[in-house]
Design a protein with these regions (language model features):
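Long, positively charged amphipathic alpha-helical accessory segments at protein N-termini or as interdomain linkers
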Residues: 3, 65-92, 102-233
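Conserved active-site carboxylates
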Residues: 99
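A short coil-to-beta-strand element that immediately follows conserved catalytic motifs
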Residues: 28, 90-96
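N-terminal lobe of the biotin/lipoate ligase/transferase fold
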Residues: 1-87
Length: 233
């Protein structure tokens, strides 16, 4: 069965794979030139002009990888990080658990959805050629380099990086956690968050070995897993 499928237009690559996961095998790659209902975590809108950015989703069904669910989001962030390093992009950082930043502005968002014990859909949105954004906190590769990129070539490069990193994860040889820790966007920052429906200010301390985030809340250390916390600007 074909692993790489591209749509000119779709509501959302993640939604498509979620609705059709039984029809496709492990590591199926679905991309689109334009998403009419692209979204990030907590259904936040993901702004992307047609044919200017990379938007794709990958289906995971491998049992070992599903057991590594807590590692996947950070691993995907490091895949994007490695691609950007290869493009000589500097001032990179990774915001736990799923965003990549350049000089404090978001260049990539990652979304995980599914039933972790059965299947997982990983959605990646990477700003490439778009120049103007409604959100001043967004940035693209072209904004940084002043170069226009072939999206098909860049997508396939990123796909190869992802496949290679997943193989390393299976062998317990991935260095994703080291990369995330060395480029931790949140480390030592005071941030506004929502925990258990309560607004709080916390200090981010570090990323733990189990991929959880250690924060200081009212002088008390607390470990947070992805999904338990929402960051606010």
């Amino acid at each position: 069965m074909k692993r790489y499928i591209h749509f000119k237009e779709i509501d959302s690559t993640n939604t498509y794979l979620k609705n059709h996961h039984t029809s496709y095998g492990d590591l199926t790659f679905i991309s689109a030139s334009y998403q009419t209902l692209g979204h990030g975590r907590f259904n936040r809108n993901w702004e992307s002009n047609e044919n200017e950015n990379i938007m794709f989703s990958i289906l995971i069904k491998n049992k070992f990888l599903l057991e590594k669910y807590s590692s996947i989001s950070l691993l995907m962030s490091t895949c994007v990080y490695k691609l950007l390093v290869a493009l000589k992009i500097k001032d990179l950082s990774i915001k736990w658990p799923n965003d990549v930043y350049v000089n404090g502005k978001k260049i990539c968002a990652i979304l995980l959805e599914g039933i972790p014990q059965e299947w997982l859909v990983i959605g990646i949105g990477l700003n490439v050629n778009q120049i103007i954004f409604k959100d001043s906190r967004a940035i693209s590769i072209r904004n940084i380099t002043n170069k226009k990129y072939n999206l098909s070539i860049l997508k396939r490069k990123l796909y190869r990086v992802i496949i290679n990193e997943l193989k390393l994860l299976k062998k317990n040889k991935s260095n994703y956690l080291e990369i995330v820790r060395n480029n931790n966007y949140l480390e030592n920052k005071i941030v506004n968050v929502e925990i258990n429906n309560q607004q709080k200010k916390v200090k981010v301390l570090k990323i733990n070995d189990d991929n959880s985030l250690k924060v200081l809340v009212n002088d008390e250390e607390k470990n947070i897993i992805s999904g338990e916390i929402t960051f606010h600007s």
